[in-house]
Design a protein with these regions (language model features):
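Membrane-proximal HAMP signal-relay module
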Residues: 1-80, 84, 89-100, 104-106, ...
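A conserved beta-strand-to-alpha-helix junction within the catalytic ATP-binding
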Residues: 24, 49, 53, 144-160, ...
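Conserved catalytic submotifs in the C-terminal HATPase_c
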Residues: 44-46, 144-145, 164, 169-179
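Conserved micro-motifs of the catalytic ATP-binding
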Residues: 137-142, 179-182
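Short helix-loop "hinge" at the ATP-lid/N-box region of the Bergerat-fold HATPase_c
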Residues: 198-199
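Conserved glycine-rich
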Residues: 204, 270-271
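Short beta-strand/loop element within the Bergerat-fold HATPase_c
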Residues: 205-215
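Acidic ATP/Mg2+-coordinating residue in the GHKL
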Residues: 223
């Protein structure tokens, strides 16, 4: 009887020890990550179907998500540091020049204008980073019935003047009374990003169009600039990405955040968006929204 008891006790111990392996592995992995900040570590366990193995699998999935967030934050820090370095260097150089070398008020004024311009660039960059962070955090937008046609008409009026000042032809063809469910401020921001992009790169003309079908509203912004290669077309929605082409040469191309912001706004509205372009043939940015009947909203 004592032998049988000891055997049962031993079997129970082994069973409990084996059952607790996933817990021990999770604890060990969590401690290693806490000490090393290495989010690439995972729980290495043989396949199993019990609850603890399922928990270990969920733990690994959580680590996958944490690693993506961690890498994204590292990349954002690197990108922001890079983007801020140039304007800050210019500001410091111009400040030193104005203080030590400028011989007259005119030279000092030129330096101050450069400093002011670069300071505004930094402010704009920070504002866009904060806006993108809020969008990526998935904050809830207040969506209501809005008239997309009216939004585009207002923007068209503004950009017609801006295009004219640059010697560009601006045309628009906007279908009337296109009603969608959305946030008016965010939709205006999306279209404004498309239009400011076109204003920057167009050679002679910009087109703003809105067409409707039975269920969809399709807006598009075309320019006749240098265009975008197929490779770049797949990447331009990424943060801080700027196409490496003649499109960017000799131009102050901005922060590289405008299209990333537009992509997040479209996602929050359940809208499709994309670009049609090829190098040397201009670009057409588009977004497609589902139409609604405001009387039923």
């Amino acid at each position: 009887m004592p032998v049988l008891f000891l055997f049962v006790l031993y079997c129970g111990y082994k069973t409990i020890k084996n059952a607790m392996k996933p817990v021990a592995a999770m604890s060990k992995t969590a401690l290693e990550i806490g000490n090393s900040k290495d989010f690439s570590k995972r729980i290495d366990l043989p396949a199993g179907k019990d609850e603890l193995h399922a928990l270990a699998s969920v733990f690994n999935q959580m680590l996958d998500s944490l690693e993506k967030v961690y890498q994204s934050e590292k990349q954002l820090t690197s990108d922001v540091s890079h983007e801020l370095r140039t304007p800050l260097s210019v500001i410091m150089a111009e400040s030193d020049y104005a203080k030590n070398y400028s011989q007259n008020l005119g030279e000092a004024k030129e330096s101050l204008e450069v400093i002011s311009r670069q300071s505004r660039k930094i402010t704009s960059l920070i504002d866009q980073i904060l806006e993108l962070s809020r969008l990526e955090a998935g904050r809830n937008l207040e969506l209501k019935g809005i008239n997309l046609s009216s939004i585009l008409q207002n923007l068209a009026s503004d950009y017609e003047k801006l295009a004219s000042a640059k010697g560009l032809k601006f045309s628009c063809d906007i279908a009337p009374d296109a009603q969608i469910l959305g946030n008016e401020l965010m939709i205006s921001r999306l279209v404004d990003n498309f239009l400011s992009n076109a204003l920057k790169f167009a050679s002679s003309k910009i087109e703003l169009n809105l067409s409707v079908s039975k269920t969809q509203a399709l807006l598009s912004v075309k320019d006749d600039g240098a265009g975008i290669s197929q490779k770049d077309s797949e990447l331009i929605w990424n943060k801080f990405y700027q196409a490496d082409s003649s499109r960017n040469k000799s131009l102050n191309t901005g922060s590289g955040l405008g299209l990333a912001i537009a992509a997040n706004i479209a996602k929050m509205h359940g809208a499709k968006l994309g670009v049609k372009s090829e190098a040397g043939a201009g670009s057409e940015f588009w977004a497609e929204f589902e139409l609604v009947n405001l009387k039923q909203v």
